[in-house]
A protein has these predicted regions:
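Non-catalytic terminal/interface segments that mediate subunit docking, oligomerization
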Residues: 65, 248-358, 363-373, 472-475
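A glycine-rich helix N-cap at a beta->alpha junction
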Residues: 86-96, 161-175, 369-381
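Active-site nucleophile and cofactor-binding loops and adjacent substrate-binding regions
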Residues: 39-48, 67-72, 100-120, 142-146, ...
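N-terminal amphipathic, basic-rich helices that act as targeting or association modules
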Residues: 1-79, 215
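Glycine-rich ThDP/TPP pyrophosphate-binding loop and its adjacent helix/strand module
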Residues: 73, 108-265, 270-278, 282-283, ...
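Cofactor-binding active-site loop characterized by glycine-rich and histidine/acidic residues
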Residues: 41-162, 299, 304, 313-314
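Peripheral docking tails and interdomain loops at the edges
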Residues: 272-273, 386-388, 408, 529, ...
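Glycine/charged-rich beta-loop-alpha catalytic/anionic-binding loops adjacent to active sites
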Residues: 29-36, 97-111, 133-139, 313-328, ...
Length: 586
């Protein structure tokens, strides 16, 4: 096998054209084996194999700098740059991340995981090169939906003025995570249909030179194209037409399903570990919203390129029709659009992963909350037990969203409470509202939840009234609070009060004052970073009093590829550890 002899780009350059084709197939086979056993981004990487081989054949990495957008399509790059063991040896699978990582290799220049940043980053590298009088090619590899993000437009706009070497490889696989949306992609389609000859050309209109490669999975065609632009003295876009999922029939046929996958059976494509029949908040949310859409044509679902985050499968998107909008990977636009829909009398619901809502902070503040428009944002997967890559942490949404004036950020503890908050959030007309969807499974508390959270603004629920110690368990950590209260009583006899705060954004001053009468310690629990979070609001309120406060959450750091249980233990977020601490300070 040729792949066994590849320890770096220099080894790729020694191969003949025919050998490069064989190498590409070997790389694809290695990728499929690891992906089926370990999981990861399937379609994006299978479609980029030939382009990656050609890049390392023509260019001279790391002297020539290649920046991969999102870098979820960099697996073949890692194989060819000395990290093949992590793809061929099951014992080493976890030795590399799923994204570019400079600590792994000199061929990686940035830790990247969010979209549409490659052109901006590469523009910076090119500018630094020019300022120092250096040489070498700078290449941004972007595609798989990333061009729909606003920063990509900003980067291209600036790149056109560089006047020096700058190459953008546009991986056009006609897909994002789901299907592409927007006028840009109609132009890419026109360029494909005319072999790049259409006079209406987005890239030349932006001021870049342009080259089209009809078969972006043909190694020799790619080599020829890359040779034409190597050492070019001005910005150029190389538009390559690729097939997402190339070489694996099921991934070619089910491109959305195989964008990313947990371990799966190669023969059938079925997940190796069954997901069971457990309820899922995304699925339940889509069913509920479709019912609301049928009753009220002003209800509209919005996604920024991740429709299944709240259960909108292709069939459900079709059923929703004009009442579902995929804006592309453009969270900023999604929030501003939702604000304006609400201002115009509509009922927008924007579903988004916790890790991606931070991309729209300015729009949350300026376009939504300053205008006080009643849009609803559903924040999924917030907490330590969801995504664990350093680029996709879901630990920061509480301080990000929870400190913006006018925002009402809710933290339901169970299924009943979530749907009550969802219904109120859609139909109320007074506040921008966000809901932190529980991330610990669909649980029932068997309660009759409140209906009007506007009348109850910043009023906490006392789930159990005791004394001496009060435990405030926020959202997904309410159940941890139940464990703490139970264990504390078991070990000390103290019957602690258990509180469901419900509101991340507000303080129930009346309740906190009342707790002073017969409590000496308040414990706060939140599934997110402590700094700037919910617990600090409680500690600040009690600061001048004699009340002791213990805040529990995740310390402020960029944890990477952690084990959730270990992270919780490291932050003393188990019932056993919390009770130990309570006994020490009482």
């Amino acid at each position: 096998m040729y792949i066994e002899k590849i320890n770096g780009p220099a080894d790729v350059k020694r191969l003949s054209a025919g050998e490069l084709e064989t190498l590409s197939e070997e790389v694809r086979g290695v990728l499929l084996k690891k992906l089926s056993e370990h999981g990861g981004h399937v379609g994006p990487n299978l479609g980029m194999v030939e382009a990656t081989v050609a890049l390392h054949y023509v260019f001279n990495s790391p002297a020539d700098k290649i920046v991969y957008d999102v870098s979820h399509q960099s697996y073949a790059h890692k194989i060819l740059t000395g990290r093949k063991a992590a793809f061929m040896d099951a014992a080493a699978y976890d030795e590399v991340s799923g994204y570019t990582e400079p600590s792994e290799s000199e061929h990686d220049f940035f830790v990247i995981g969010h979209t549409s940043t490659s052109v901006s980053l590469a523009t910076g590298l090119a500018k630094a090169r020019d300022l120092k009088g250096g040489t070498g090619n700078v290449i941004a590899v972007i595609g798989d939906g990333s061009l729909s993000g606003g920063e990509a437009f900003e980067g291209l706009n600036n790149a056109a003025e560089l006047g020096t070497n700058f190459i953008v490889i546009v991986n056009d696989n006609q897909m994002s995570i789901a299907e592409n949306h927007g006028g840009l992609y109609r132009n890419l389609q026109l360029l494909r249909e005319t072999d790049g000859q259409a006079p209406c050309n987005f890239f030349t209109a932006m001021g870049l030179d342009y080259l089209y490669v009809k078969d972006g999975n043909n190694v020799q065609a790619l080599i020829d194209a890359f040779r034409k632009v190597k050492d070019i003295g001005h910005p150029v876009a190389v538009h390559i037409n690729t097939l997402k999922g190339k070489g694996y029939r099921l991934a070619e046929q089910q491109q959305e399903r195989f964008h990313y996958s947990a371990p799966f059976c190669l023969e059938t494509g079925s997940p190796s570990v069954g997901s069971g029949n457990e309820d899922d908040y995304g699925d339940l949310t889509a069913k509920y919203l479709l019912q609301e859409m049928k009753k009220d044509r002003t209800v509209v679902g919005i996604t920024a390129g991740t429709p299944t985050v709240f259960g909108f499968t292709p069939e459900r998107r079709e059923e929703a029709g004009r009442q579902f909008v995929d804006v592309g990977i453009a969270e900023e636009h999604a929030v501003a659009m939702a604000s304006a829909i609400a201002a115009g009398g509509g009922k927008p619901v924007f579903g988004v992963y916790s890790t991606f809502i931070q991309r729209a902070y300015d729009q949350l503040s300026q376009d939504l909350c300053i205008n006080n428009n009643p849009a609803l944002i559903l924040v999924f997967w917030g907490g330590a037990s969801t995504m664990n890559d350093v680029t996709h942490l879901c630990l920061f949404d509480i301080p990000v969203i929870g400190n913006i004036p006018n925002m009402v950020y809710l933290a339901p503890t169970c299924r009943e409470e979530y749907f009550a908050m969802l219904e109120w959030g859609i139909h109320q007309t007074e506040h921008p509202v966000a809901i932190r969807v529980p991330a610990n499974g669909v649980l029932s508390r068997g309660i009759e939840p409140e209906k009007d959270y506007g009348k109850l603004l910043n009023r906490y629920e006392v789930a159990h009234r005791g004394g001496q110690v009060a435990v405030l368990g926020l959202g997904s950590f309410f159940q941890l609070g139940e464990e703490v209260v139970g264990k504390l009583k078991e070990e000390t006899g103290v019957d602690a009060t258990l509180v469901n705060p419900r509101f991340i954004t507000g303080v129930d001053e009346a309740l906190l004052e009342d707790l002073k009468r017969d409590h000496t310690l308040v414990v706060t629990l939140e599934d997110g970073v402590l700094d700037g979070g919910f617990g600090e609001k409680i500690a600040r309120y009690y600061g001048a009093s004699g009340m002791k406060v213990l805040n529990y959450g995740i310390r402020k750091e960029f944890a990477d590829r952690y084990d959730a249980g270990e992270l919780l233990r490291d932050n003393r977020l188990t019932a056993l550890q919390i009770v130990e601490d309570i006994k020490k300070v009482r």
